[in-house]
Amino acid sequence: MEKKFITTQGAPAPIGPYNQAVLINNTLYISGQICLDPQTGNLKNRDIQDETHQVMQNLKSILAEAGMNFSNVVKTTIFITDMNQFSEVNEIYGKYFNGDFPARETVQVSALPKFVNIEISMIAVQSW
């Protein structure tokens, strides 16, 4: 089993003892991303749309570092603090995929790191 740690400056550095992503054989496991701007380290959290866009951009950068894109994503997990924002999240999230949506669950949680409103993790597979 080949294991490689994926790190890019296009996504924020981890805020705890974990890696941005781990590639094992042809499967990429991406740690949950929040709305930190990788250049400034500041939160982009004016509203749920801004947060979701920044999270998706962070995920896009990690995918690219591993030679992948959103078409390689097979599973996502979305954590949100307010299920009333579900449709707004879906509107932004859906724009990053070309209609071939991965499997997914969305879970409401009481709080997230740095008091953001959304966190998304992904699993992607290199073309077979």
Walk through the language-model features, giving the residues of each.
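Short, polar/acidic, helix-capping and beta-turn segments at strand->helix junctions
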Residues: E2-W128
